[in-house]
């Protein structure tokens, strides 16, 4: 599997995504950013229940609350637009990681989202190291970037 398989996704803008001005409602960009990295880890091969807690089975003992996020709009995004969503994750330290999402329309970047998550123990809420499978996803996602830098 090539990184492009799990790092470049598609999103079609629907009527319900937009406000009365006919452009996406601002909160949808962060929603799409989060959904994109969720989809990315699933395509990579990490089951979502291994990352996100399911309190009915308590399989995951780790939670990843968002500690910082931002959205930047560079051009209007309208109903019917087909966007490429490029995911760029990176590890900040042992318990923090960031996922940048770049939204591209017709070859031009039209928006970007940034979400920073903190890895916490589900019971104590203490900071803990990122799980191995998440670290592997981040590392694999950055292999092509690291090769270009060499």
From Swiss-Prot:
<keyword id="KW-0378">Hydrolase</keyword>
<feature type="active site">
    <location>
        <position position="19"/>
    </location>
</feature>
<comment type="function">
    <text>Catalyzes the hydrolysis of 1,4-dihydroxy-2-naphthoyl-CoA (DHNA-CoA) to 1,4-dihydroxy-2-naphthoate (DHNA), a reaction involved in phylloquinone (vitamin K1) biosynthesis.</text>
</comment>
<dbReference type="InterPro" id="IPR029069">
    <property type="entry name" value="HotDog_dom_sf"/>
</dbReference>
<comment type="pathway">
    <text>Cofactor biosynthesis; phylloquinone biosynthesis.</text>
</comment>
<dbReference type="Pfam" id="PF13279">
    <property type="entry name" value="4HBT_2"/>
</dbReference>
<comment type="similarity">
    <text>Belongs to the 4-hydroxybenzoyl-CoA thioesterase family. DHNA-CoA hydrolase subfamily.</text>
</comment>
<comment type="pathway">
    <text>Quinol/quinone metabolism; 1,4-dihydroxy-2-naphthoate biosynthesis; 1,4-dihydroxy-2-naphthoate from chorismate: step 7/7.</text>
</comment>
<protein>
    <recommendedName>
        <fullName>1,4-dihydroxy-2-naphthoyl-CoA hydrolase</fullName>
        <ecNumber>3.1.2.28</ecNumber>
    </recommendedName>
</protein>
<dbReference type="GO" id="GO:0042372">
    <property type="term" value="P:phylloquinone biosynthetic process"/>
</dbReference>
<dbReference type="GO" id="GO:0061522">
    <property type="term" value="F:1,4-dihydroxy-2-naphthoyl-CoA thioesterase activity"/>
</dbReference>
<dbReference type="InterPro" id="IPR022829">
    <property type="entry name" value="DHNA_CoA_hydrolase"/>
</dbReference>
């Amino acid at each position: 599997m090539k990184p492009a398989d799990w790092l470049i996704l598609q999103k079609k803008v629907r009527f319900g995504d937009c406000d009365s001005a006919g452009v996406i409602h601002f909160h949808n960009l962060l929603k799409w950013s989060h959904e994109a990295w969720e989809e990315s880890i699933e395509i990579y091969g990490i089951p979502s229940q291994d990352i996100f807690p399911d309190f009915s089975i308590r399989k995951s003992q780790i939670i990843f609350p968002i500690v910082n996020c931002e959205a930047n709009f560079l051009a209007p995004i309208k109903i019917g637009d087909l966007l490429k969503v490029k995911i760029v994750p990176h590890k900040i330290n042992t318990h923090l990681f960031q996922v940048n999402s770049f939204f591209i329309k017709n070859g031009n970047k039209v928006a970007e989202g940034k979400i920073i998550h903190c890895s916490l123990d589900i019971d104590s809420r203490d900071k803990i190291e990122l799980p191995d499978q998440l670290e592997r996803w981040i590392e694999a996602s950055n292999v092509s970037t690291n090769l270009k830098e060499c």
